[in-house]
UniProtKB/Swiss-Prot annotation:
Protein name: Polyribonucleotide nucleotidyltransferase
Parts forming coiled coils: none
Main location: cytoplasm
Alphabetical list of Pfam families matching this protein: KH_1 (PF00013), PNPase (PF03726), RNase_PH (PF01138), RNase_PH_C (PF03725), S1 (PF00575)
Chain's role: Involved in mRNA degradation. Catalyzes the phosphorolysis of single-stranded polyribonucleotides processively in the 3'- to 5'-direction.
Catalyzed reactions per annotation: RNA(n+1) + phosphate = RNA(n) + a ribonucleoside 5'-diphosphate
Record-level Gene Ontology MF annotations: 3'-5'-RNA exonuclease activity; magnesium ion binding; polyribonucleotide nucleotidyltransferase activity; RNA binding
Length: 705
């Protein structure tokens, strides 16, 4: 590629897409600067010169956010970017998934693909620019890669599909779909939707693929102009003589072990066969490299037989039919002090979800490159080692946990009631207690149960199911409700979540080059059938959301005031609102339109805070009577508090019907007097009269007599 700068441009979805090569990051194997509108992303691809001694392909994909891209300085003391945001982690996964299947089997050189977001135009997706740049950086490099791939975002407004919708269009869209693929097929799908039918989702996917083809043609033109020749990297291969020897030793016993239906018994049986082969080789003083290859042959034998049984005999490892769901059970209300809890079990996969309700002030504040500043609905996913019967370090959430949590959040968000109808922050935590595949979808089902148990008035229950695929040449089998072994040894993990009305979330990962429309259609329809069965099971446990919230959940009281009076409630430097919070123990959130949310676990404290606020914003009216308390006495009169925060003066001449010599002769501090407002002067000072009230009472008595 040399040192010369090259620039390539096309129009993409009504905006200019420009690629620059040859100027930046020239020591990487491949690097491109992608400009999409005012968004700019630098993508680079680098590979190690030697293969790593690993039994997997060491690919790392990073999407790096820089706050300077949106003109921000990071908060905190350090003033530099720290750990990646949730959005950055999800974007890294989004780019990794369509790229990973396009490296050859046996590729063991470490590959690192890094996209640095340098400028952000909110209407021009930095994630799509980074995906395009990551593919192109690999393609123009000398790293062997069977791309290119590209991705687009598809929205739908008023029934019409839109490629790469802007922020305003996305807010109106009932679909937010990211689809990626090669020129010939789709290999990654990620979507959120507002209960959209399967047929429409399939249309959106295929609509996006047409635009992907254009982007791939553009990449091919660039590669033809500036691409490097691919280097010859040796692939890891097993010695065929050794493979035949291991096969002769173990194949018969492995075939029997594979057909044991129970997970742990099957794993133990397979492990025993593998152990016998390894021990034989150790007795023969075979070297470590040979023993490692023997283990790889054994794993390949297991994989091939599981796949053969599924494609040729339609027999699954646990004996189910291809469209059969594992036994289902569910339960709610397990944890008495939580606001809501739901347990969902599907075979040997089990998730317990807990719903917690909070005030609107408990929203998550987002500090990133997007336009969204906060969110009031959160779903977090935890996967402890004991769920698979293993030990391991307890760390914070990794990419997988964050990805599964976000998928559940996307699936459930369309059914969360609006802030107006339900002024609460909602947090769901899903604890995976047992795992044999499809835990993310179990967490969606358990979370639905937890919200219904908590009394959240969701629009409809949501269930999720994971579909699998085993493909051999032109023949393929779509599997419903895949378990761990089918996920590990199969070709697809296609997660579909939704209500009885339609899809709310999709996520598809594959290990082959891509999928045809026919396979996608079959998988979606088979998933719909399974989802309906799961929903029926869940609704037999709890048919509708509970009619009232847990007594341990905060009670939220809503009131409305004149927006001009907000400053009176807050007070100088927040003094007034902090005093209300201190006196009552409530939480107070104030909207700009004057809507106030008061929350507490004690309803009487909510009412007390409401009364204080009402008094603070109350308008004094001339001619009205008020019961005031004497707060201060001067020679010329008494100052009364007629309601919280509002004082008025009763002049000495207005204290009684007769002449008063000293104020103290009539009132003392703490006395309560019924007074009438006679005047509010230009400075807002309130003049009161006790004499006027006494005169009216006297006249009334005289009339009655």
């Amino acid at each position: 590629m040399g040192q010369e700068k090259h620039v390539f441009t096309i129009d993409w979805a009504g905006r200019q897409l420009t690629v620059e090569t040859g100027q930046l990051a020239k020591q990487a194997n491949g690097a491109v600067l992608v400009r999409y509108g005012d968004t700019a992303v630098l993508s680079s691809a680098t590979a190690s010169k030697e293969p790593k001694p690993l039994d997997f392909f060491p690919l790392t994909v990073n999407y790096e956010e820089r706050l300077y891209a949106v003109g921000k300085i990071p908060g905190g003391f350090i003033k530099r970017e720290g750990r990646p945001s949730e959005k950055a982690i999800l974007a890294s996964r989004l780019i990794d998934r369509p790229i990973r299947p396009l490296f050859a089997d046996g590729f063991r050189n470490e590959v690192q693909v890094i996209s640095i977001v340098m400028s952000v135009d909110q209407d021009c997706s930095s994630e799509m620019a980074a995906m395009f740049g990551s593919s192109l950086a690999l393609c123009v490099s000398d790293i062997p890669f069977e791309g290119p791939i590209a991705g687009v975002t598809v929205g739908r407004v008023d029934g019409k599909f839109i490629i790469n919708p802007n922020v305003e269009q996305l807010e109106q869209s009932d679909i937010n779909l990211v689809v990626a693929g090669t020129k010939d097929a789709i290999n990654m799908v990620e979507a959120g939707a507002d209960e959209v039918p399967e047929e429409t989702m399939l249309e959106a996917i295929m609509y996006g693929h047409q635009e992907i083809k254009r982007l791939i043609e553009f990449q091919e033109e660039i590669v033809k102009a500036v691409g490097k020749a691919k280097i010859d990297i040796p692939l890891y291969e097993v010695d065929q003589t050794l493979a035949d020897e291991v096969k002769a030793l173990a194949e018969t016993d492995l075939l029997k072990a594979i057909q044991v239906h129970e997970k742990h018994a099957r794993e133990d049986a397979i492990s025993a066969v593998k152990k016998a082969v390894v021990e034989k080789f150790e007795e023969e003083d075979r070297d470590e490299a040979t023993i490692k290859q023997a283990k790889d042959v054994l794993n390949k034998l297991v994989k091939n037989e599981v796949r053969r049984l599924i494609t040729e005999e339609k027999v699954r490892p646990d004996g189910r039919g291809v469209d059969q769901i594992r036994p289902l059970s569910s339960e709610v209300g397990l944890l008495p002090r939580t606001h809501g809890s739901g347990l969902f079990t599907r075979g040997q996969t089990q998730a317990l979800s807990i719903c917690t309700l909070g005030a609107l002030g408990d929203v998550q504040i987002l500090d990133g490159l997007g336009v969204e500043e906060s969110k009031r609905f959160m779903h977090h996913y935890n996967f402890p080692q004991f769920s698979v019967g293993e030990t391991g370090p307890m760390r914070g959430p990794g990419r997988r946990e964050i990805g599964h949590g976000a998928l559940g959040e996307r699936a459930l968000e369309p059914v969360i009631p609006s802030e107006k109808d339900f002024p609460y922050t909602v947090r769901l935590v899903s604890e995976v207690l047992e795992s044999n595949g499809s835990t993310s979808q179990a967490s969606i089902c358990a979370s639905t149960l937890a919200m219904m148990d908590a009394g959240v008035p969701i629009k409809a229950p949501v269930a999720g199911i994971a579909m699998g695929l085993v493909k051999s040449g032109e023949y393929y089998t779509v599997l419903t409700d895949i378990q761990g072994m089918e996920d590990a040894l199969g070709d697809m993990d296609f997660k579909v979540a939704g209500t009885s009305k339609g899809v709310t979330a999709l996520q598809m990962d594959i290990k082959i080059d891509g999928l045809s429309k026919d396979i996608l259609e079959e998988a979606l329809q088979q998933a719909k059938k399974g989802r309906m069965e799961i929903l029926d099971s869940m609704l037999s446990t709890i048919p509708t959301s509970r009619g009232e919230l847990s007594r341990y959940a905060p009670k939220i009281l809503t009131m409305k005031i004149n927006p001009d009076k907000i400053r009176d409630v807050i007070g100088p430097s927040g003094k007034q609102i902090n005093k209300i919070i201190e006196d009552t123990g409530v939480k107070i959130d104030i909207e700009q339109d004057g809507t106030i949310f008061i929350s507490s676990t004690e309803e009487d404290m909510n009412q007390k805070a409401k009364k204080i606020i009402e008094d603070l914003v109350r308008e004094v009216e001339v001619g009205q009577l008020y019961l005031g308390k004497v707060k201060r006495i001067e020679k010329f009169g008494a100052f009364l508090e007629i309601f919280s925060g509002k004082d008025g003066l009763v002049h000495i001449s207005e204290l009684a019907l007769d002449r008063v010599g000293k104020v103290e002769d009539v009132v003392k501090i703490g006395d309560e007097l019924l007074v009438k407002v006679t005047e509010i002067d230009k400075q807002g000072r309130v003049n009161l009269s006790r004499k006027a009230v006494l005169r009216e009472e006297k006249e009334k008595e005289e009339k009655q007599s």
